[in-house]
A protein has these predicted regions:
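Catalytic core of nucleotide-sugar-dependent glycosyltransferases
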Residues: 143-144, 196-204, 208-235, 254-267
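A general structural signal for well-ordered alpha-helical segments in protein cores
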Residues: 181, 218-221, 295
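Structural register within alpha-helical repeat arrays
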Residues: 237, 241-244
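Membrane-interface aromatic/basic loop that binds lipid-linked glycans or pyrophosphate carriers
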Residues: 254-307
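Short, solvent-exposed polar/charged micro-motifs at secondary-structure junctions
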Residues: 123-126, 244, 283-287
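Nucleotide-sugar donor-binding/catalytic module of glycosyltransferases
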Residues: 1-214
């Protein structure tokens, strides 16, 4: 049976990784309908590496740099499949990923998103992602307060409903995936499989948090707060916004981080993150980045040891 899944890959300066990523798609036991790569104004040889693969499944689209959200949206708009399987240009799939997604779609129809578990590759070892342990339709907002349910490279979306929600928020440089997950999970069920079929590259050089710059966007997590929404829904919004604000503060965005600390002070679940943000934001800017990096390294070391 012909696949109804289009693979969507935003690409920006990944000439060393993109061939490996594409080979992981072409090695799938169940082949996709197409692979759409949107080169978002790369300044290295990324586009040339894509062309060298030479697969008829691959369609390369080149555009001026507009950000990862615009690249993903462009790919979904150009796609033909009912579903869009997201994959970043430095992550990879295990050979059975698409087959597992197709099995989930057959077993749990009418969901807005389907995802699997993943491993984190830090360049030295694989560490299991902290994800749910059971299969099926999940209570997304409750699960996402303590686990990773959706990350871009492990998630396949029903394409047209996502586009009808506006797609990914263009101009948002960090947290754009969580912004969309919030809107999607408020309108559609989310399905999950604990099979670890994705490798997320923690060693990537230009992940959004590593290259944060001031945003020029009309989108904000504040827009997602709904007084009438379930508590877990608003708690998820606060969690995403405060996590982003930590990075913003470390990069010198004192006023923006202070605004987030004030607006999302309603959180009960993430009081520790709120306190950490307030303390970090009160320090001299030159201290913030090194302190946050040290904290994150310690947290990652603890996670790897399973403590």
């Amino acid at each position: 049976m012909k696949s109804d899944i289009s693979v969507v890959i935003p690409l920006y300066n990944k000439e060393k990784e993109i061939a490996r990523t594409l080979r992981s798609v072409l090695a799938q036991t169940s082949q996709p309908l197409e692979i759409i790569v949107v080169d978002d104004g790369s300044t290295d040889g990324s586009a040339a590496r894509v062309e060298e693969i030479g697969s008829p499944l691959i369609r390369l689209i080149q555009q001026e740099n507009r950000g990862v959200s615009a690249a993903r949206n462009r790919a979904m708009q150009e796609a033909c499949g009912e579903y869009a399987a997201l994959l970043d240009g430095d992550d990879t799939w295990e050979p059975g990923y698409l087959a597992e997604i197709e099995r989930l779609i057959a077993a749990y129809p009418n969901c807005g998103a389907y995802a699997t578990s993943f491993n984190v590759d830090d360049g030295h070892r694989l560490t299991p992602g902290d994800t749910p342990q059971t299969e099926g339709v999940v209570d997304f907002f409750t699960e996402a307060l303590s686990h990773y349910v959706l990350i871009p490279s492990s998630t396949t979306l029903r394409r047209k409903p996502v586009l009808s929600l506006g797609g990914f928020p263009e101009g948002m440089r960090m947290g754009e995936d969580q912004y969309l997950w919030t809107k999607l999970a408020r309108t559609s069920p989310v399905c999950f499989s604990p099979a670890r079929l994705v490798r997320y590259s923690k060693a990537a050089s230009n992940r959004s948090a590593a290259i944060y710059r001031p945003e020029q966007t009309r989108f904000s997590f504040e827009d997602l707060y709904e007084p009438a929404a379930r508590d877990s829904s608003n708690e998820y919004v606060a969690r995403a916004a405060l996590g982003k604000a930590l990075v913003v503060s470390a990069k010198g965005g004192t006023a923006e981080a202070a605004r987030a600390a004030k607006f999302f002070a309603y959180t009960r679940h993430d009081r520790r993150t709120l306190r950490k943000l307030r303390i970090l934001n009160a320090l001299p800017v030159r201290w913030r980045g090194p302190l946050l990096a040290a904290y994150n390294r310690l947290a990652w070391a603890i996670a790897r040891k399973g403590m």
